[in-house]
Amino acid sequence: MTINPVSRKVAWLRVVTLAIAAFIFNTTEFVPVGLLSDIAESFHMQTAQVGIMLTIYAWVVAVMSLPFMLLTSQMERRKLLICLFVLFIASHVLSFLAWNFTVLVISRIGIAFAHAIFWSITASLAIRLAPAGKRAQALSLIATGTALAMVLGLPIGRVVGQYFGWRTTFFAIGMGALITLLCLIKLLPKLPSEHSGSLKSLPLLFRRPALMSLYVLTVVVVTAHYTAYSYIEPFVQNVAGLSANFATVLLLILGGAGIIGSLVFGKLGNRHASSLVSIAIALLVICLLLLLPAANSEAHLAILSIFWGIAIMVIGLGMQVKVLALAPDATDVAMALFSGIFNIGIGAGALVGNQVSLHWSMSAIGYIGAIPACAALVWAVLIFRKWPVTLEEQPH
């Protein structure tokens, strides 16, 4: 099934709107990282206790990505996007109104349901909507939306939370989603489901050792990153003893470096994805090991955050490119699995960071995160030597 030919301008406008949607979805996933202290104060809880919200959100996405993708596999994609945006917006209104922590968690579960479906279909939709021969650029644009969520979304969300309250941050995200929904309704054609795969494609994917090895690498390296990243805001304030404003600046630097990582991968990723990902994981190991030693200086933390941000963006993009290359016949199923596995890593990392902070010391989150990062580095070198693969640009 093909989409009726449209002008390149309209095609790019559709992809840009999807990228904006990616920005909004990733902003709401990441923004609690910058608001943990404020939410904890609001509900008279410890920061580490509130942090369990990150794990719940991520694991709901992980568990529901594949079931929701299969349940909606035959649903027309434009209608599906509209439905999940309505759920997303309503859940943000509930976040804004949340009268206790339990209600806030329930609202986040609603958002996670929408997230689970959105990220399982977005990459394949971007490829379908892009101008002919521009699939890699379309994916890069979606990745840019993801990066901007860390560069702009998370820090702006934190600033709004600081000055107007964390509830206003969630309300603003909901309103941004409403505007994006109206644009999607206006711009998108009917998009019959295609290449979505089904349960029948699962055994086929599971019989691909390169893909399974990549999924293992994903969960380990993401766990490593989020062990430290989930608690970077309270770490900066409580361990490093630096200001709340500097915590905001650090999040901005970390996200901004992600844009650099995206540009680097855009230039070299098609030909050197394996090498780039391996180097980025090695860089992540170094950054995690140096997190506590760097905490004695704003400058040291800022420099470390630049390399950390570049590393994690290259890792994320590299994984996505490789998954798409290894499962071109079942992109939605493969990406649903990838999204689920990625979020298992987010939830596991946030939980490890939570337990270290509660029962040991928040100062150790970098060292603890470096342990799975080292394991990921060894695994990456082994599997990329055995199964080197790249995503070739193909006209469609």
Swiss-Prot record:
Location of the protein in the cell: Cell inner membrane
Cellular component GO terms, alphabetically?
A: plasma membrane
Look up and give the membrane topology term. Multi-pass membrane protein
Which spans are transmembrane here? Answer: 15-35, 50-70, 81-101, 103-123, 136-156, 169-189, 209-229, 246-266, 275-295, 301-321, 333-353, 364-384
Where it mainly occurs, coarsely classed, is: membrane
- GO MF, one example: carbohydrate transmembrane transporter activity
| Domain of life per record | Bacteria
Write down the InterPro entries for this protein, in alphabetical order. MFS, MFS_dom, MFS_Efflux_Transporters, MFS_trans_sf, Sugar_effux_transptr_put
Keyword annotations for this protein, in alphabetical order, are: Cell inner membrane, Cell membrane, Membrane, Sugar transport, Transmembrane, Transmembrane helix, Transport
Coiled-coil segments, which residues?
A: none
- UniProt similarity note: Belongs to the major facilitator superfamily. SotB (TC 2.A.1.2) family.
According to its UniProt entry, what is the function of this protein?
Involved in the efflux of sugars. The physiological role may be the reduction of the intracellular concentration of toxic sugars or sugar metabolites.
Q: Which PANTHER family match?
A: PURINE EFFLUX PUMP PBUE, SUGAR EFFLUX TRANSPORTER
Q: What is this protein called?
A: Probable sugar efflux transporter
The organism named in the record is Salmonella schwarzengrund (strain CVM19633)
Instruction: Provide the organism lineage as a comma list.
Output: Bacteria, Pseudomonadati, Pseudomonadota, Gammaproteobacteria, Enterobacterales
The gene behind this protein is: sotB
